[in-house]
Amino acid sequence: MASAGPTGAGARPPKAFTAQAGLAKLVNPAGLNSILARGKEKFGGTQAWKELMGCDVIFARSISHWYGIKGTTYYELTVALGQPLYKPVTDPELTEEEKAVMTAVQSRFAQSNSSVVLTRTLLNKTCELKDRIRELTDELGQTEVHLAREKVKAAALKLENRKLFVENQELKDQLEKERTKHGWKGLKTLCLWIFLATLIGGYITGSNAACTLVDVPSPMKVGYDTFKQMCIHKDSYLPDGAFDKESLALECSKQMDYMDCKEVITDSISGKTSFAGMLRDVFRVDEIVTAIRTVVRFAMDFSLAYPICVMFVLILTRNKKHAIISACCALVAKCCGLRLLPFTLVLTYAPSETAIAGCIYGLGYISIPLVTFLHWVGLVLKAILVPDDCYIGTRVSHALAWSIMLPMWIITQELMAFTEFPLELQIVTTVVVCTAGFGFRYLTGTVTITEPDGTVKKYKRIFNAKSAIGTISTVFFEKAKAIRGVIPSFPSKADNIVKIEVDVDGGSAGVGFRLGNYIYTAGHVVGEAKIAKITWKGLTSQAKVLGHIELPLFTDTLARLEIPKPFQQLPVFRLAKSSENDYVQMVCFDNQLQNVVTFSGWANIDGDYLNAPFETYAGTSGSPIINRDGRMLGVHFGSNAVVSQGFVITRLFATEPAVKQCKSDEDLADEIVRKVMGGIRISFASLTSELEKQRDELNALKQMVNDLIDTDLVALEKKKGKTKRTVRGQKHKTKAISKAAFMKTKVLTEEEYRRLEEEGFTKDEIKDIVDNLREQAWLDYQNQLDEEGDDDWYEQMEEDQRINDQIDQNIERDLEDRGEWYGQRKITFKQRAMLRFIQLGRQQQVATVSFPDGYEDRAEELYNKVVTTEDLPEGETSEAALSLPNKIVHQAGKRLNFKHVKIHPDKTFMKSGVTQIEEKPEGDIILKAKTTTLAPKEEPVIQQVEQQPQVEQQQQPQQPVVEEKKRTPPPKPQRKPKTGAKAKCLDCGETFVERQDFHVCKSKN
């Protein structure tokens, strides 16, 4: 069989010619229209002209001489014996340049065909995406319905929780009542209740349940029904002008006897009084005056001794324990001859040794100097030998002070024995001395404060008292004139907040405040962190998270942190006394968490929930919300649109809140409520996160559809003869890979990425490296496309020439045997099977395999071996195409096994190219150069083969031709050839080197 290349009679050797890139883009319309018109005049209406018009590309040599190319076959239209002759030619009389131009134009039309196929593919993908969007929309609707049901369930559970909470509170109150019912506190409460009930009952009880007429005029008369409601068995007053006895009796006679009615009405009137007498009677003026006179007379008779002593006794017996101790003290004081008040003070403040020493002296067994000396020695020895939390010097000083106080107490006892100094006078004297000595001294004392930055401030407490009185007055008047619509001024609390940061779960930041001896913030700010970083006035320290306080019927918690030692001067918030709708202010930091900012607005309070029109941002969670007095009202936890969501903590901190401690059986109801709320919180959070995921996926799909809609899709009209499903139309389909696919390709492995990080590259630098690699891959891919579109013509030309020669010989043989006129025969053309493989990833691989006629099964078998069922990882793409005369198979996104793409070559063409880009402001200047070299045929063979007849070798069909293009790896150092043992072929007798030469018997070539 003839080898590739023009053969046969009249064949001319191909001239050296180089086709330029972009040749298919050139157009030369000069004279073409007129030539076509003249050709139609000469050949129009003939079958030969119709066949010529069915070619892909037509070239006019002259009016009577035309060439056409269809697929890989050239056709010629001439005039023979005055008749048009249309026939296929093997070697057309065309120059290489003319052939190159026709081939380039033909490839352009094939590319248009592939664009139509790509358009249909994109339309199909668009329809699939729309179906997917419709499915996701349905799922979203179902999710929203499910969420609505869960919300209804949550509302029902919330209502049930409120009922359980109220019931639990009632049970707690009942339990508390049962505990204190028979105790000391319950007994005192019972006595006080009986006393107050007696007074109130005597105060409100009327004399006789009847009406009293008041001497005032009235324009209206009362009816019997009204009179009955006001006066029958009731103590009330009735204007004399509204009372008409006869009218009332007549109206009453409708129901009972007239005389009985008059008797009932007369009995219901107790008498008549003036308006002033009515007022004195209603307000019990006479009784109040009498009670006051009685108390004054009692005080005058018994002086102040009785009430003062009563208060003294009540304080001493404030509970059961102190009542027993006070009784013992009174007994000891009586036995030892000591005054009760000084002895009580000594027992309260002095060491027990001092009280014992006084009792010993009171018994009369020892003198004052001796008891003072022994007392002094004992206290000092105890201070020296018995350590405690105080410094030894402090303990000795205290011992010395009480050693001096003992003789003073004894001398005072002796002086009081010679004078009349009653108990009430002792109590009053003690109160006056303590008030003057300690109260005024504390009030006028100077306070020194050292700020964290080192500045020292001094002020007197009396000035703070004055300012407090002024502030209270101002707040009172501001409260009185509070009007919605006029925002009041708030006290500055810029120094009362701190910034809180944690590094757990990606890190978070918020605001904290001091309340009592702890710092508080929103629970989600610290999360599960154990340590938080706190910043105040530029000073940063670490604080331990002590726990979380559960908020009743709320989805968040309140985190409690300890106060670091450097932050002991952090100002403390005071709780608001009441929570009601009013203007409030939220104190927080700005977006950069640097400067203090405030939000002011009207707050709506519903139970423990607080809503205010604050458009907050990330980092404001945990901010304190204060009222117009500067007192702590609530805590900010988040925002819904432009409405701040907060929680009122005034009732929460009315008692010490629990911080995740163990619960007793009595708190079982609270535990159930908290567990139910926790379940609702978790289910709601999971539903919300799932809904957000579906929304994100839906938005991504919508964006993909919008991108596809915005993409310009070229839909060209089909031309006659271009619908044939051959590989020329199919192979360009693989070129329609966008640059966006390359910019998403994964070019670095995990090991390479970690190695770059270990070498000190930042994320931005690594991103730049990856982008450069992807850009270079895109340029290499474009170069390969240009090579396939522009430089494959030589190999294709040789293969086409071989097939055309064979067809031409068969046609000539048939013409000679049958003698038929060519214009009456069917057109003969050749269709070939072709494979196309492309895989783009870290390594780009492209391969094209074309087969001669009759090898369709082998092409399909090779296609099935190369294309696997394994999906490519994210960032890599692949396409495989099989073109047969009767079908086209296309597969994308599967891994391709290029190991099976191989043949036994007889010729090898080596290619090398370079692409250079010069960047200019107006655009890039691109240079592409390529060199193709025919490698010399090697002496083949790797093993011995069996001898076969020469005839079978000649009848063996032409092997398929394969083209495989890969990214050229970096050059590796060439090793020196190894010298192996020589061997001799048993068939042909040729000598070759083992493990080095590839040997094939010459008789089989």
From Swiss-Prot:
- Region ranges (Disordered): 940-984
List-wise, which residues carry O-(5'-phospho-RNA)-tyrosine? Y753
Molecular function via GO: 5'-3' RNA polymerase activity; serine-type peptidase activity
Question: Gene3D superfamilies per the record?
Answer: Trypsin-like serine proteases
**InterPro entries in alphabetical order:** Astro_VPg (IPR045836), Peptidase_S1_PA (IPR009003), Peptidase_S1_PA_chymotrypsin (IPR043504)
User: Where does the chain cross the membrane?
Assistant: 239-259, 286-306, 313-333, 344-364
Which enzyme class, named as a word?
hydrolase
Is tRNA processing found in the keyword set? no
Q: Where is the composition biased (Low complexity)?
A: 941-961
Catalyses: RNA(n) + a ribonucleoside 5'-triphosphate = RNA(n+1) + diphosphate
Q: Name one GO biological process term.
A: proteolysis
According to UniProt, residues marked as the site described as Cleavage are I204, T205, E478, K479, E717, K718, Q730, K731, Q809, N810
> What are the alphabetically sorted keywords of the record?
Covalent protein-RNA linkage, Host membrane, Hydrolase, Membrane, Phosphoprotein, Protease, Serine protease, Transmembrane, Transmembrane helix, Viral RNA replication
- One GO cellular component from the entry? host cell membrane
**Annotated catalytic residues:** H524, D556, S621
Task: Identify the EC number(s).
Answer: 3.4.21.-
Q: How is it modified after translation?
A: Cleaved by the viral and host proteases. The protease is probably autocatalytically cleaved.
Please verify whether the record's keywords include Transmembrane helix. Answer: yes
Q: Which family does it belong to?
A: Belongs to the astroviridae polyprotein 1A family.
The protein depicted here goes by the name: Non-structural polyprotein 1A
Q: Which organism is it from?
A: Avian nephritis virus 1
